[in-house]
């Protein structure tokens, strides 16, 4: 995310995020129903997820494994003993009239997540650690579909789709360590990177796989007491998170300065009008009347299980960034871009493992290939240019077989059709001319054909060297070694 517009400096925002991550298990958290997205309404349901009397839930072991792995990735404490609780509330899309969640004994507590903030102009990266209060498992609710409107207001009637009921969720609660919309958006993005690297969720905000609620208050700088906390919902992109927070900070500051009350409430982010609007009074935990879930036994995580799950952890984004900077000599910015997506990082590493220069490969991936991916709307695993071929291309440049200019000329064909860069260059006669005698012959012919330019150069107009270098490149179809051509042109022109 780019650097946010600063708010009035005499106030500070206190921000915490509650993030719901939908897991990509094939079955629901307490039954065998499918979790497939976009199935026909009410087809992925059974008596358990619909809350029929007399049925008993059974925990999906994969959900527990995902929770523990994410907890480990967040540098958190994994509880050896935890339990499930019933969170009671009445809503049309909650068939049991309670949600199975975790309250006072969550599976994960006391973690942290380091985020990186990028300055838009300088590309400088600064780091900040955000505390993680807890992470717990719970089941999702169903989905209300409002006919005639995207919200209840203005709709003619509402329908309930229970397919999502019982889909497994992890809720990650941050400490109130966030101070701006930029930090909040980056925190959410880093969480998404983690769940994608772990392979436990696609983290797609548009499809609801990652949902963030923001808790925010403002206070004068130096004041220890918190202001009145407001919750914001309905943000389906990282930019929406940043914009909603920036708007709400300004709204609350204006209210404080005008002496207007700030209510503890839930507000909705209205994307079309770029503002937050009041939705309902905010509930407290006592309103949910939590009590232990009687149909599920307590959870115990043994040291043996914990160690087994630790062994399954991949190299995480922050670890990759550090290795790229320290071992491969990349800038913090390039390391960040390359590790943003696990598939891109794996592509990059495969190319480097061919023996190609790490920095040169990074330049090709973050610039030319990234531009192609952006324009074609493809992922890196969908392009025809395989990482081994990119490594081969970079090594051809390093050895002087081709110039960077020639490499850029054959890149479109490689991206569209794939193949061996070396064979393409040889078949088209595009190998770089690196023989000094051959280049000298071209320069001498040009000097003979342009005596006045030679005289002007020797009279002090040194910029004319560029004219001769350009003509050499033109005569050779861009195949002459640019560095060698510059050296030889200077030598011959100076007589």
UniProtKB/Swiss-Prot annotation:
Organism of origin is Crocosphaera subtropica (strain ATCC 51142 / BH68) (Cyanothece sp. (strain ATCC 51142))
Q: What does this protein do?
A: Allows the formation of correctly charged Asn-tRNA(Asn) or Gln-tRNA(Gln) through the transamidation of misacylated Asp-tRNA(Asn) or Glu-tRNA(Gln) in organisms which lack either or both of asparaginyl-tRNA or glutaminyl-tRNA synthetases. The reaction takes place in the presence of glutamine and ATP through an activated phospho-Asp-tRNA(Asn) or phospho-Glu-tRNA(Gln).
Listed HAMAP family: GatB
Family, similarity comment: Belongs to the GatB/GatE family. GatB subfamily.
Q: What are the record keywords, sorted?
A: ATP-binding, Ligase, Nucleotide-binding, Protein biosynthesis
Spell out the Pfam families in the cross-references.
GatB_N, GatB_Yqey
The reaction(s) annotated as catalysed by this protein in its Swiss-Prot or TrEMBL entry are: L-glutamyl-tRNA(Gln) + L-glutamine + ATP + H2O = L-glutaminyl-tRNA(Gln) + L-glutamate + ADP + phosphate + H(+); L-aspartyl-tRNA(Asn) + L-glutamine + ATP + H2O = L-asparaginyl-tRNA(Asn) + L-glutamate + ADP + phosphate + 2 H(+)
Please indicate if the UniProt record lists ATP-binding as a keyword.
yes
Q: What do we know about how this protein assembles, alone or with others?
A: Heterotrimer of A, B and C subunits.
Q: What is the protein name for this chain?
A: Aspartyl/glutamyl-tRNA(Asn/Gln) amidotransferase subunit B
EC code(s) of this entry: 6.3.5.-
- Top-level EC class as recorded in UniProt: ligase
State the gene name recorded for this protein: gatB
InterPro entries the UniProt entry points to:
Asn/Gln-tRNA_amidoTrfase_suB/E, Asn/Gln-tRNA_Trfase_suB/E_cat, Asn/Gln_amidotransferase, Asn/Gln_tRNA_amidoTrase-B-like, GatB, GatB_C_1, GatB_Yqey_C_2, Gln-tRNA_amidoTrfase_suB_CS
User: Per its UniProt entry, which superkingdom is the organism in?
Assistant: Bacteria
BP term (GO), one: translation
- GO molecular function terms listed in the Swiss-Prot or TrEMBL record: asparaginyl-tRNA synthase (glutamine-hydrolyzing) activity; ATP binding; glutaminyl-tRNA synthase (glutamine-hydrolyzing) activity
């Amino acid at each position: 995310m780019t650097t946010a517009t600063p708010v009035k400096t005499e106030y500070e925002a206190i921000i915490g995020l509650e993030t719901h991550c939908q897991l990509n298990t094939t079955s629901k958290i307490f039954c065998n129903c499918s979790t497939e997205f976009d199935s026909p309404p009410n087809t992925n349901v059974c008596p358990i997820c619909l809350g029929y009397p007399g049925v008993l839930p059974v925990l999906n072991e994969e959900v527990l494994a995902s929770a523990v792995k994410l907890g480990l990735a967040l540098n958190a404490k994994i509880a050896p003993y935890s339990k499930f609780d019933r969170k009671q509330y009445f809503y049309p899309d909650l068939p049991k009239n309670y949600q199975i969640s975790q309250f006072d004994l969550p599976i994960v507590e006391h973690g942290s997540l380091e985020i990186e903030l990028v300055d838009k102009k300088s590309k400088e990266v600064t780091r900040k650690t955000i505390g993680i209060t807890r992470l717990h498992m719970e089941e999702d609710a169903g989905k209300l579909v409002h006919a005639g409107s995207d919200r209840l207001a203005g709709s003619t009637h509402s329908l309930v789709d229970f397919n999502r009921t019982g889909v497994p969720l992890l809720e990650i609660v941050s400490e109130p360590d966030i101070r701006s919309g930029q930090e909040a958006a980056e925190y959410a993005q880093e969480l998404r990177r983690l769940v994608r690297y772990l392979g436990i969720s696609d983290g797609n905000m548009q499809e609801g796989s990652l949902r963030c609620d923001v808790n925010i208050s403002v206070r004068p700088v130096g004041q220890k007491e918190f202001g009145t906390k407001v919750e914001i919902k309905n943000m389906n992109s990282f930019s929406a998170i940043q914009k909603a927070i920036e708007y709400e900070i300004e709204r609350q500051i204006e209210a404080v300065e005008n002496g207007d009350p700030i209510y503890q409430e839930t507000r909705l982010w209205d994307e079309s009008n770029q503002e937050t609007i009041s939705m309902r009074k905010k509930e407290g935990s006592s309103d949910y009347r939590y009590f232990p879930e009687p149909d599920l036994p307590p959870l115990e995580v043994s040291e043996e299980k914990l160690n087994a799950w630790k062994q399954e952890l991949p190299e995480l984004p922050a670890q990759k960034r550090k290795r790229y900077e320290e071992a491969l000599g990349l800038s913090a910015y390039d390391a960040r871009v390359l590790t943003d997506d696990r598939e891109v990082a794996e592509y990059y590493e495969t190319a480097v493992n061919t023996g190609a220069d790490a920095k040169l490969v990074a330049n090709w991936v973050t610039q030319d290939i990234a531009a192609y991916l952006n324009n074609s709307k493809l992922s890196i695993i969908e392009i025809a240019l395989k990482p081994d071929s990119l490594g081969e291309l970079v090594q051809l440049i390093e050895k002087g077989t081709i110039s960077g200019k020639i490499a850029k000329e054959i890149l479109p064909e490689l991206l569209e059709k794939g193949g061996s860069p070396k064979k393409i260059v040889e078949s088209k006669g595009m190998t770089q001319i690196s023989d000094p005698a051959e280049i000298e012959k071209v320069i001498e012919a040009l000097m003979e054909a342009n005596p006045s330019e030679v005289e002007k150069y020797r009279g002090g107009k040194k910029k004319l060297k560029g004219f001769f270098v350009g003509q050499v490149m033109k005569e050779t179809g861009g195949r002459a070694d640019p560095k060698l051509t510059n050296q030889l042109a200077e030598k011959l022109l100076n007589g």
